[in-house]
């Protein structure tokens, strides 16, 4: 079957599923100017709060998922993994190769999505929760009939909520363990830093503010300077000083190995669940 190009300058975007991730993507697209809200639609069946969230920035809320697919050139599946097969199977007659299909459902492989949809013009994307503040780390993998132009459209769309990379799907379990679950590891680290500040005598609100800004600043140093984190660490570590003393304690506690083990364990669990 002939693959029809998606009109990059005028395509319509539909979300199957109206949860927080779909909202984050839609808001990012509107905020960045990638798409006007008039070209975005979703369906909300019962939850009035979700309907209100989308309508608050101009997205069209339609009566059914069927309507969303009919009116959309690009269809994003943003439903819980256990519901994907049922949802896709019901929409199969409408999922022609005129449509570019995108899945953000965790753990659902392209081969299954393509089989259920009867369409291999699919792109799988793994975003993470900082999409809500425009700082997602997303990775995409293209299915059998997805074109380079399709990939460019999705890269621009997900670029509106952070940064996006392309990778083979075989890496997605490891990506889940790192960037998918990673925000929770960092939240734990921020909480621990703040608790350490309190233990050292700081007021709780000041300690938490300093901890979160310190992590944000350190991450920005890595991404913006291009320096290896080990070099940046060495740059602020003086002989016999406070920082090397703190690092010594972290090394004694197995800090590096514990973080590495967390990523590996989460990746293993992702493989078990997919």
UniProtKB/Swiss-Prot annotation:
It comes from the Eukaryota. Gene3D superfamilies: NAD(P)-binding Rossmann-like Domain, ProC C-terminal domain-like. The keyword Cytoplasm applies. Keywords: Amino-acid biosynthesis, Cytoplasm, NADP, Oxidoreductase, Proline biosynthesis. Pathway: Amino-acid biosynthesis; L-proline biosynthesis; L-proline from L-glutamate 5-semialdehyde: step 1/1. Belongs to the pyrroline-5-carboxylate reductase family. This is Pyrroline-5-carboxylate reductase. It comes from Glycine max.
């Amino acid at each position: 079957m002939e693959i029809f190009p998606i009109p990059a300058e005028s395509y319509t975007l539909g979300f199957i599923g109206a949860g927080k991730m779909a909202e984050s993507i839609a808001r990012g697209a509107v905020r960045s100017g990638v798409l006007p809200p008039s070209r975005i639609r979703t369906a909300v069946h019962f939850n009035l709060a979700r309907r209100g969230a989308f309508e608050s920035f101009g997205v069209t809320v339609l009566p059914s998922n069927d309507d969303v697919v009919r009116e959309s050139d690009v269809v994003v599946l943003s439903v819980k993994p256990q519901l994907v097969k049922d949802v896709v199977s019901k929409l199969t007659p409408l999922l022609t190769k005129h449509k570019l299909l995108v899945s953000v459902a965790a753990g659902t492989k392209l081969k299954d999505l393509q089989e259920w949809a009867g369409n291999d013009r699919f792109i799988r994307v793994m975003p993470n929760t900082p999409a809500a503040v425009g700082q997602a780390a997303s990775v995409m993998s293209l299915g059998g009939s997805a074109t380079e132009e399709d990939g460019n459209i999705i890269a621009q769309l997900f670029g509106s909520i952070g940064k996006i990379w392309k990778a083979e799907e075989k890496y997605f379990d490891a990506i889940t363990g790192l960037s998918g679950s990673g925000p929770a590891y960092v939240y734990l680290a921020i909480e621990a830093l703040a608790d350490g500040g309190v233990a050292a005598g700081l007021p709780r609100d000041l300690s938490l503010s300093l901890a979160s800004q310190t992590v944000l600043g350190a991450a920005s140093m890595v991404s913006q300077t291009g320096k290896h984190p080990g070099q940046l660490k060495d740059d602020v570590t003086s002989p016999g000083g406070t920082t090397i003393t703190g690092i010594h304690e972290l090394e004694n506690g197995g800090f590096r190995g514990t973080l590495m083990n967390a990523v590996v364990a989460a990746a293993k669990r992702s493989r078990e669940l997919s």
